[in-house]
């Protein structure tokens, strides 16, 4: 029985999940946080147990060593040979990767080369890949790209209306993100609806700290809200989403704290969205508490958030010429029934009727009334499982 580990490396973290394959059984999972900082934290969960230790972990290579030591220390594996595959989540695959890829030196170089498209994510992914290759050089190593699912978009969708030389010379175009999540929940939606994915029109809404909406036609992404980078689209936890680009030079010229375009983009990525408008938090739970206390900034942040998501869903209903189902997933999508209710309330013209008894915290599946023309589903995402499946698929080749 082989084991496959799915890795999601951040700039100072390494999240992992160990599977028995092909049974798709989760054996253990964990996260290593504060890599490169004092008092790093390694957390392992297995057999209804939880182990946490405080260490000083200087880099991703040491983090991988700690991870593997934890697996043997707790008896989760007897030796490293039980792990036959590792899959790495990579945010940006650019135009190099239309599907998951077996790792070699060239693939690692290309992942690093694409760091400009995902500066917070790709360098960390490359560090995680290099660490596993150094410690376990003989296992099957696979990169799974967030952008790959969106490579089915057509030029009229992914090109920006700017001179084409910026695409031909610099590959400036829409790439999208969260593709692994969008693909997974679309597949699960088809199962729940009892229909082939190849005949469905779906709108998938990944609503977490990052937010992206995708139009899925017969199993393929035909449009998505994130763009050249994951900054585009609806309002997010700390990201602005779409804004007028002329705002950037205007702020550089008028605000002494924003010295250049990079400073503005940093502000748009890390200090905007729910956090920026509310002035207090990027967490929807805090925003909803502000609604209860009638905090005007929380009310405004919430209303902007709902408005932006609603507009993208409406846009994709037009692109698809209607939809069979709308799927909510990720942190807020799965756990914020008020948000779902208020987004769908503005779409009742399309014949969508929520069932208030089903649209509650902790309920998954169809949350509409039986006669709703468009179904609304809440489906927990599982990007790690998709990564493990791709490792198994490529191992078999």
Curated annotation (Swiss-Prot):
Name its pathway. Metabolic intermediate biosynthesis; acetyl-CoA biosynthesis; acetyl-CoA from acetate: step 1/2
Cofactor binding comment, as recorded: Mg(2+). Can also accept Mn(2+).
Chain residues that bind ATP:
15, 206-210, 283-285, 331-335
- Keyword check for Metal-binding, yes or no: yes
Molecular function per GO: acetate kinase activity; ATP binding; magnesium ion binding
The record's InterPro entries line, in alphabetical order, gives: Ac/propionate_kinase, Aliphatic_acid_kin_short-chain, Aliphatic_acid_kinase_CS, ATPase_NBD
Q: Which residues form the active site?
A: 146
Q: Which residues bind substrate?
A: 89
- Catalysed reactions listed for this entry: acetate + ATP = acetyl phosphate + ADP
UniProt-listed GO biological process terms: acetate metabolic process; acetyl-CoA biosynthetic process
Q: GO cellular-component terms in the record?
A: cytoplasm
Q: Where is this site: Transition state stabilizer?
A: 178, 239
PROSITE patterns to which the protein is assigned, alphabetical: ACETATE_KINASE_1 (PS01075), ACETATE_KINASE_2 (PS01076)
Record key words, sorted? ATP-binding, Cytoplasm, Kinase, Magnesium, Metal-binding, Nucleotide-binding, Transferase
Major enzyme class: transferase
User: Which family is it part of?
Assistant: Belongs to the acetokinase family.
Protein name as it appears in the record: Acetate kinase
Provenance organism:
Streptococcus agalactiae serotype III (strain NEM316)
């Amino acid at each position: 029985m082989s084991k496959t580990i799915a890795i999601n490396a951040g700039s100072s973290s390494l999240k992992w999940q160990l599977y028995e394959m092909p049974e798709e059984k989760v054996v253990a999972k964990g996260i290593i946080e504060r890599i490169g900082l004092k008092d790093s934290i390694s957390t392992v969960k297995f057999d209804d147990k939880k182990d946490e230790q405080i260490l000083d972990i200087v880099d991703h290579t040491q983090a991988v060593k700690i991870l593997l030591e934890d697996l043997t220390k707790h008896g989760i594996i007897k030796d490293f040979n039980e792990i036959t595959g590792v899959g790495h989540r990579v945010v940006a695959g650019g135009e190099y990767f239309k599907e998951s890829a077996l790792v070699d030196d060239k693939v690692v170089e290309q992942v690093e080369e694409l760091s400009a498209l995902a500066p917070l994510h790709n360098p960390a992914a490359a560090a995680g890949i290099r660490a596993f290759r150094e410690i376990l050089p003989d296992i099957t190593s696979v990169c799974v790209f967030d952008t790959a699912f969106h490579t089915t978009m057509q030029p009229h969708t992914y090109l920006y209306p700017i001179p084409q030389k910026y695409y031909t010379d610099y590959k400036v175009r829409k790439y999208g993100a969260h593709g692994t999540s969008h693909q997974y929940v679309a597949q699960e939606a088809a199962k729940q609806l009892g229909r082939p994915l190849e005949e469905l029109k779906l709108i998938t809404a990944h609503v977490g700290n990052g937010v992206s909406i995708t139009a899925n036609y017969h199993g393929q992404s035909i449009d998505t809200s994130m763009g050249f980078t994951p900054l585009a689209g609806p309002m997010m936890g700390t990201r602005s989403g779409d804004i007028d680009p002329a705002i950037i030079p205007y702020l550089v010229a008028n605000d002494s704290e924003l010295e250049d375009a990079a400073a503005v983009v940093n502000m748009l990525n890390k200090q905007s969205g729910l956090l920026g408008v509310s002035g207090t938090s990027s967490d929807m739970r805090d925003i909803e508490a502000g609604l209860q206390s009638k905090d005007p900034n929380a009310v405004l942040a919430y209303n902007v958030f709902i408005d932006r998501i609603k507009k993208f869903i409406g846009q994709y209903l037009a692109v698809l010429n209607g939809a069979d189902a709308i799927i909510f997933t990720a942190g807020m999508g799965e756990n914020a029934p008020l948000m779902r209710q208020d987004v769908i309330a503005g779409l009742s013209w399309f014949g969508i009727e929520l069932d208030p008894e089903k649209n509650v915290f902790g309920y998954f599946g169809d949350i509409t009334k039986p006669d709703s023309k468009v179904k609304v589903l809440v489906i927990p995402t599982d990007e790690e499982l998709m990564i493990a499946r791709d490792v198994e698929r490529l191992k078999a080749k």
